[in-house]
Amino acid sequence: MNIQALLSDKVSQALIAAGAPADCEAQVRQSAKAQFGDYQANGVMAVAKKLGMQPRQLAERVVELLDLTGIASKIEIAGPGFINIFLDRQWVAEKVEYALTAPKLGVAPVEPQTIVVDYSAPNVAKQMHVGHLRSTIIGDAAVRTLAFLGHNVIRANHVGDWGTQFGMLIAYLEKMQNENASDMGLSDLELFYQQAKKTYDEDEEFALRARAYVVKLQSGDEYCRQMWRKLVDITMAQNQVAYDRLNVTLTKDDVMGESLYNAMLPEIVADLKAKGLAVESEGATVVYLDEYKNKDGEPMGVIIQKKDGGYLYTTTDIACAKYRYETLGADRILYYIDSRQHQHLMQAWTIVRKAGYVPESVPLEHHMFGMMLGKDGKPFKTRSGGTVKLSDLLDEAVERAGKLIAEKNPDMPADELKQVINAVGIGAVKYADLSKSRTTDYIFDWDNMLALDGNTAPYMQYAYTRVVSVFRRAGVDETSLTLPLVVTEDREATLATRLLQFEEIITTVAREGTPHVMCSYLYDLAGLFSSFYEHCQILNAESEEIRQSRLKLAMLTAKTLKQGLDTLGIQTVERM
């Protein structure tokens, strides 16, 4: 049930009937204050200006023509021409009843699209670190949200699995006479990488051999391919442990590494030349873009093939977009990559559009994000200044949550305690990130993220346990609630209306890739339920009808909190 969309349609019809153009915008919004109704239509002023009318006069005409019979109990004009809409409580009650039993909480089915979501993208032969966290969990929240709405979502884990580093690793493994890479853990590989890089920088003979292995690998040499495959498999097996701990939906089947596009690169360079988009410049192949200027004000040159024949990330990203449209059949392509890559992506996509590889009708969207910072406002590091490994961060989260939860639950069975601690610890790290606007940097703070009050995972998880505890105490389940829902008290109406706004929220998150909007909604919902619970008797209500009615509101609150948190990849618990 998308009330905003319903009211927008009704107000638009009335505006058009009053003489507005067919493309007019009703600008229906949720009201910020109860005195202005549940919704407010703000589009009259802009339309009145176009029509040369007084806004108030047009608003009066729109209200005359606005048919909200059975939906609104009152419609008012405020100020110069705002239209305030107060929802009918009987209508609200009926819609809550529907949401309780309907699939997906009454969220309307969408026209399914094939949507490719590019996220996580760790590098082979390196452990995941905190720098991978934002892409991984924000991207996964988008995937979960889009899938919930009914879209065909293709997860694309653009793993860094190609390049000169593999020549170094294979050469160094050989040098160390440790060719059986399957016996190594990833920590060994990371150390090997560091030592290989040091040797590569200091030993010219070794560097030549490493470069030779790169050529052999690229030409399909069986030995090099086997070693490369082992390195990839070991890395992704370790990464899967992190994904599982994070409750992220990525699996090995979602890996679409850089190597996937290798065969396409020569064809793309040849095609861009044939189309007159790419030219030779000092031995390299370059695309000059008028849309981007260098410091001299001339079109910027984007290299797609070096003079030694090597390709660049831009070439791979062009191939990647082409593949996602032509082979995967994408209707929409989303990239969860940090903001520092924005110009690089825009240049690649400009070439993609000019070449006709992806039509304008298929959006290419960079859902960029800022950095995770320490309390000092600098990039989050270990005390010694090193990069924080993701596994270490998650270990600490669980350890800290353990102290918090064990103190409060001395009698909880060990298995349940372990599950709760894990859900709270991992949830705290994820929610702290997801609750911030992804476009901004944010401060990583253990105390804030594990707090049992405020907009945190522990608070939200505890709020959920409070709601479900009502049913344990009442000794009822959904099937025993047979009496109709009635909404009479203001707090009942406020909670019920907010519950019905779930579809508006999840639609916004799906459109804009902004999970913090869901976090804000759930936090608000938890607060409204708390107020309702304190002021409206549930178990000791004055009549059985009111008791069952309020239990139904509590039931939909529990379902909405659980579903909302699930779209964020946050696990709920029954006790805490």
Curated annotation (Swiss-Prot):
GO terms for cellular component: cytoplasm. It is found in: Cytoplasm. A motif ('HIGH' region) lies at residues 124-132. GO terms for molecular function: arginine-tRNA ligase activity; ATP binding. Transmembrane segments: none annotated. Keywords: Aminoacyl-tRNA synthetase, ATP-binding, Cytoplasm, Ligase, Nucleotide-binding, Protein biosynthesis. HAMAP family: Arg_tRNA_synth. This is Arginine--tRNA ligase. It comes from Yersinia pestis.
